[in-house]
Amino acid sequence: MAEKFESLMNIHGFDLGSRYMDLKPLGCGGNGLVFSAVDNDCDKRVAIKKIVLTDPQSVKHALREIKIIRRLDHDNIVKVFEILGPSGSQLTDDVGSLTELNSVYIVQEYMETDLANVLEQGPLLEEHARLFMYQLLRGLKYIHSANVLHRDLKPANLFINTEDLVLKIGDFGLARIMDPHYSHKGHLSEGLVTKWYRSPRLLLSPNNYTKAIDMWAAGCIFAEMLTGKTLFAGAHELEQMQLILESIPVVHEEDRQELLSVIPVYIRNDMTEPHKPLTQLLPGISREALDFLEQILTFSPMDRLTAEEALSHPYMSIYSFPMDEPISSHPFHIEDEVDDILLMDETHSHIYNWERYHDCQFSEHDWPVHNNFDIDEVQLDPRALSDVTDEEEVQVDPRKYLDGDREKYLEDPAFDTNYSTEPCWQYSDHHENKYCDLECSHTCNYKTRSSSYLDNLVWRESEVNHYYEPKLIIDLSNWKEQSKEKSDKKGKSKCERNGLVKAQIALEEASQQLAGKEREKNQGFDFDSFIAGTIQLSSQHEPTDVVDKLNDLNSSVSQLELKSLISKSVSQEKQEKGMANLAQLEALYQSSWDSQFVSGGEDCFFINQFCEVRKDEQVEKENTYTSYLDKFFSRKEDTEMLETEPVEDGKLGERGHEEGFLNNSGEFLFNKQLESIGIPQFHSPVGSPLKSIQATLTPSAMKSSPQIPHQTYSSILKHLN
């Protein structure tokens, strides 16, 4: 486990110390690499996103993401637990400290899978798609109420827990703050949304868009859940716009004129009736779902439903409950965007000295008024209708001081006399962990009674009211049993389940090791591995010492072959002497062929039994050899011993008594036997069958090993005499 952890640390540069274990790569976020790990302090699996800070631009994006995700708190948004520095160090609330780091780690809630992986298995049932779409709109309503644009909505950024069918929006790496009371034209980044989920307005004006771009992406995702494939999958921006115009009607004339000035080839006089309407692209869906989708996928963002309006659509009536669809109580404003600029360039510090416009040259009717404020109380920004949008002319929004809550925005928490920086634990043995407040019965003071991480805003309220939605009631039989089984587990706090994740990991590793041992034990002969090993050995270069030994061995074989020829000539001379002795014994045994044995005084033996014994000894001798070379050198030693012994008649007889009718190769010389036992008609004419048998069994026809000299049976015949 330690080696695996260190290898991942070295490859991907994760430096979190020993607190986190069992790192597993999950993917890449909008601006960082994401891993899952188990927190040893609380025995909980979390997702960790690493953001590398290489230049001022990356620091700006990291600051923006951290600022947004720390303030967002919703049941359909992935929760963030901690922001860590290198080696798992805790970061201070000082904004400038972020510029001194080379990387930061965002520890957030771990989700089981994402919508992209689910859709790889095929389309969803319409009821499941409606449930997920409701949760997506519910999260978007909260995000947009906080004046935040996600700008990267796609199935891969929508995370799901399959056990309870909860969907959460994640990866705010490309999100940004957009105060609706100020114009952002010309100051928005281009090409952030994934191409397949870009709205027509974003394709025409990449740096001028509103919250409606998130709603277009949500509509494309809903259609993808119903069909299992991307609704508009263009290879480039021009093809993407072409696919949209084939299915989405262009109602307003000003939109058609704008298209005519950009892509006149694809523009017709009447574009209210598309060639391939959504009814053809989405066959089989209900009429209510089609009407719901047509009101979201509109060409003009002004005609498009907002998240709040979409939740009120009749198609969502089975889930919609406005009291259970909260909005942000502390939305972002223009000064939060200015903080990013101040951090990146200290030369803009004079922006703090902006003055209000006391006298406005525009009338009150020229300005859109927010519904929550009286027209007399709202400070009008003359820049909103101006073509000049320099950052230095940005008007600070005075609405933040209208309700008299000036202490909310004090830059130093010490100015608040009612605020205590000391942690107020409910219990003396309380542990300060960032995750336990989600599952344990007591709070860990996370996001409560503490100043904001980056913007130094001190909330007046002592406690943040976390909103918890009731469980969505839906009759989905596929998940009923699983919910019942896990009800007991959810009743326990995470602290009581401490050690469960580690024990599960250890059990998985033990089972994998056991399975590997079983495979090794039951593994048979692998022909492919044998061939691969043989090819590998044959391709290797042989050492010089081995080649020299092989050459010496070949020369030894040649010398033995020469000696065998000499031994063969000696054996032929002995054979001629044995033939002469056979002539004297023709009359001794007239019917020896019919008898079962040959008698020679006290020394008598069965011929067949003798042959079998000799063959068994030969086989036993060969079985004792461990290799071909052992057998070869054993034969060589036997040959040398035979050549050193003198060949005399007396000793030859003794040797014949021991070896009988067998030569050194264990073969029986039948032609000598036929002559010695005096078979009738043996001396018949040459054409007789026995003579032909004798001709086929002559010593020249009987092949034996060249390393072993032939033997004759003269000693045996002498013994019989």
UniProtKB/Swiss-Prot annotation:
Protein kinase domain segment(s): 20-316
**Post-translational modification, briefly?**
Phosphorylated at Ser-189 by PAK1, PAK2 and PAK3 resulting in catalytic activation. Phosphorylated by MAPKAPK5 at other sites. Ubiquitination at Met-1 leads to degradation by the proteasome pathway.
Please report, in chain numbering, the residue ranges of the motif FRIEDE motif.
332-337
> Which branch of life, at top level?
Eukaryota
Keyword Hydrolase part of the UniProt annotation = no
Compositional bias of kind Polar residues: 701-715
According to its UniProt record, the EC number is: 2.7.11.24
Identify which cofactors the protein needs according to its UniProt entry.
Mg(2+)
The catalysed reaction is: L-seryl-[protein] + ATP = O-phospho-L-seryl-[protein] + ADP + H(+); L-threonyl-[protein] + ATP = O-phospho-L-threonyl-[protein] + ADP + H(+)
In the UniProt entry, which residues are flagged as the active site? Answer: 152 (proton acceptor)
Map out region (Disordered) in residue numbers.
Answer: 701-721
Q: Where is this cross-link: Peptide (Met-Gly) (interchain with G-Cter in ubiquitin)?
A: 1
CDD domains cross-referenced by the UniProt entry: STKc_MAPK4_6 (cd07854)
Could you tell me which residues carry Phosphoserine? 189, 386, 452, 556, 558, 665, 684
Family matches, as PANTHER family: MITOGEN-ACTIVATED PROTEIN KINASE
Any idea what this protein is called?
Answer: Mitogen-activated protein kinase 6
Q: Name the positions where ATP binds.
A: 26-34, 49
Q: How does it assemble?
A: Heterodimer with ERK4/MAPK4. Interacts with (via FRIEDE motif) MAPKAPK5. Interacts with UBE3A; this interaction may be indirect and mediated by HERC2, possibly via HERC2 interaction with NEURL4.
Classify the main location.
cytoplasm
